[in-house]
Every structure is written in C-alpha cells, then in structure tokens.
Amino acid sequence: MKKFQSPFSEFTSNALTLITGTTLAQVIPVAISPILTRLYSPEDYGVFALFVSIVAILSAFASGKYELAIMLPRRERDAANILGLTFVLAMVSSAISLGVLAIFNESISQVLGNEKIAKWLYVVPGAVFLNCVFLSFSYWENRQKRYKRLALNRVVQSGFTASSNLGIGLGGYGWGLILSSLFGQSVATT
C-alpha cells in the first residue's frame, strides 16, 4: 500500500530547513552580544553601523539588482549568464566606487560626520563586491534548490563572524567588527 504523501511535504521540509538555518544564524550574535558590548566601544559600533550602511546602499546599486533575476529564466544557461552579469556589474561598480572614494575620501568622511570611517572607506568597494557575490550565489543556490547549503552558509557566516568578533575584540582592536563581518561573509561565499 502506497504511503500518502502530501504535496506540501517537500515545500514544508525546505521551508523548515531555511527557517532553522536562519534562526540559528540569528541566535549566535544575540547570544554573544553581552560579551561584545564589553569588548567594543559605542564608537566602534557607530563606525561599524556607518560602514554597513554605506555597503548596503552601494550594494543595492552595484549589481543592478540583477541577482533577483537569477531565479526567473527557464534555461539554466540563461540563469548562469545572469549570474555572470551580476559579477561583472559588481566588479565594475566596485572599481568605480574605489576611484571615487580614493579621490573624495576626506570629503565623504566629513559629510558623514565621522573621521574614523575615512580609513574604512577604502575597504567599502571590496565589501560591496563581496556582498553582491554572496547575494548572487544565494539566489543561485536557491534556484538549484540547495536549501540545506543555504541554511548552512548562513550559520557558518554567523559563526565565523561571531568567533572572529570575539577573538579580535579580546585583542582590544576596535576594528574587529568590520573585519569580522568581512571575514564571515567571505567564508560563507566560498
């Protein structure tokens, strides 16, 4: 006798996999936040928040949001071409933003009202590129229905970010928040 299979069982399983991964990835930083608030100053968090905001805004434009289109094509080849396009656009945008930031670094940091961000503005283009690649691969993995891998990537990113935040913070380096964020995302992207 055939076992009754709900048409939603695969969907439910995939959704639960993603929900579990996302939940674990969010629990990790919440769990260590009491420690991190003692290792990093409010000023360190301010510079980090400003850095993340700049990267998020530039990332929204860098790839032209073409990563959203990776899911749409019927043919795998077309989706792969869109994936490649997002990489090229992100690379070109990052190179242009590096030039702009190199020329106007001091002016930008003055407009932002934070002199400490000036040295981190040079890192922004690389972070934008990394963010675009990470998002593009996430959509690609979603298209390939690799939900366990997506969930694992989120947990790995969160875990590596948290552990490097702790390690660098214990060393007394305020820049650890930014570096750890980049480290966690680069590990999850590979």
Q: Predicted regions: what is each one?
A:
Residues 39-42, 111-114, 143-144, 170-172:
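Helix-loop interface residues and adjacent transmembrane-helix termini in multi-pass membrane transporters
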Residues 118-125, 151-190:
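Hydrophobic alpha-helical transmembrane segments
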Residues 19-22, 28-32, 46-74, 87-90, ...:
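Small-residue-rich midsections of specific transmembrane alpha-helices
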Residues 30-35, 136-140, 162-167:
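Alpha-helical transmembrane segments of multipass membrane proteins
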